[in-house]
């Protein structure tokens, strides 16, 4: 341990960022070495030589030994004294700075009282009023005339320069004000012109300082109702600019095409923008039409999704609506310059049909808007915890119902005309009457519902058409009603058949029939029954002598169209009646046995006759054929 030595650890001396200022260095030299008067060159050389031979480590060790000799209590007393001195100096400096600040503030309060009051102490505010201290120059030194002349020249120059600057600023402000007035006048004139044409001008909800024009429909879907308001901006020259926001630049519309098989046979016209597209009214009309068309296609797509069971198909930008087995309607949203399909064939009739469908869907959307307005003006329903769903508009369903009903009418009318032609070719008089769309009657005037809404409301109700006619025998008739409904279940088209057959009062067809083949089979079967009942009546009503010698036919199997007669000598004959849409066939058979024979025992007819509607040959009538077959 005797070999150990003590090493003092000192902090690393860092260089100062900024050197001490010259006055501070002079003050340090005076405090350490005294005044400069006591320094000489010889004394400085001696101090330099002493510093060269001096051991700095030894000096530090002596200082450490002296410091270790001091007691701990003395060090604390010395520390407290130094701290008290520092605090006293700081308080004194703060007090002197406060006095100086109060003095300057009181002096400035004569000229700028409000600004000076903010820097005064509370004691000074209560002790001295504002502006009580002022300063002025006492006995200023005289200035020469040249200096006064220069000051006046400089002051005059500054005033002239300020006057010129003020004049330039006033002229610029005047020209700018004139330009602004002209721009504002032009802007407000165009705004008034828009208002005079019937458009609603209002403030924007989120920009209270901006005006907007309401061109949309207030009863539309909230998504499109909010888009029906555009800002009326002003350009630099004062022209009115319509800020359409999310509305596309090109005008768009719903296009309706008719496809038959794989060919497009008809296409509707999309509304084109006005020729004067630069005017503000044309832009408003274009924006209104575009928003209306977008809402129309949105509602069509929304309704088409719930009509999947009716055969309606949807794609990304296409709706396919079936009309018949070979024809369907295509709806899509396109730009105004794409309204014509390049693959479409030239067909004026189908183009008119496509335009009619396009106008119909627009009318139905407008009718839905009016219904929304009517519901909104009525008292609200009771509150419910669940939010009421927004029902889909009836746009596609009325059109589908009308086209489907019309297709069934054409089919039934064609069937009845074919049967009438066959019967008339056989000399059977018949009369048919058709009342198409009997549900669309004359409108009753009403003060509550406008006539336009009443007309549109009729097409939303189920469609009803009636076909009636007389059959062969007296008092025999039939009646067919076609009912089509796509709004409420049951959906589709149904036939309601009723017949009046005095010879067969118990025969009644099914009440609701949905298939056309069944309707065709029922109607031909009823007519065949009536023909079978008319043949025996015709034989009995013949009053001449030749007719008395004829045989009388009896109906054996009416639903099979079979009649027979049995003569006195035991001869038996059978008559077979077959009726279809294309022809009427009657055959007679000679039977060798008595009446107990089963139907169809004979293999080849003895007499037969077929009547067709389009047959150019002259054929005997049904009465003549029955008379010939009744000969003994």
UniProtKB/Swiss-Prot annotation:
Biological process annotations from GO: regulation of transcription by RNA polymerase II
Keyword Chaperone part of the UniProt annotation: no
One Gene Ontology MF term: transcription coregulator activity
GO cellular component: core mediator complex; mediator complex
Compartments reported by the entry: Nucleus
Name under which the protein is recorded: Mediator of RNA polymerase II transcription subunit 17
Gene: srb4
Membrane-spanning ranges: none
Residue numbers spanned by region Disordered: 1-21, 50-72
Species of provenance: Emericella nidulans (strain FGSC A4 / ATCC 38163 / CBS 112.46 / NRRL 194 / M139)
Record function comment: Component of the Mediator complex, a coactivator involved in the regulated transcription of nearly all RNA polymerase II-dependent genes. Mediator functions as a bridge to convey information from gene-specific regulatory proteins to the basal RNA polymerase II transcription machinery. Mediator is recruited to promoters by direct interactions with regulatory proteins and serves as a scaffold for the assembly of a functional preinitiation complex with RNA polymerase II and the general transcription factors.
Lineage: Eukaryota, Fungi, Dikarya, Ascomycota, Pezizomycotina
InterPro entries for this protein: Mediator_Med17
Complex and partners: Component of the Mediator complex.
Matching Gene3D superfamilies: 6.10.250.2620
Keyword set includes Transcription: yes
Ranges annotated as biased composition (Acidic residues): 58-72
Main location: nucleus
Family: Belongs to the Mediator complex subunit 17 family.
Keyword field: Activator, Nucleus, Transcription, Transcription regulation
Alphabetical list of Pfam families matching this protein: Med17
Basic and acidic residues compositional bias, start-end: 11-21
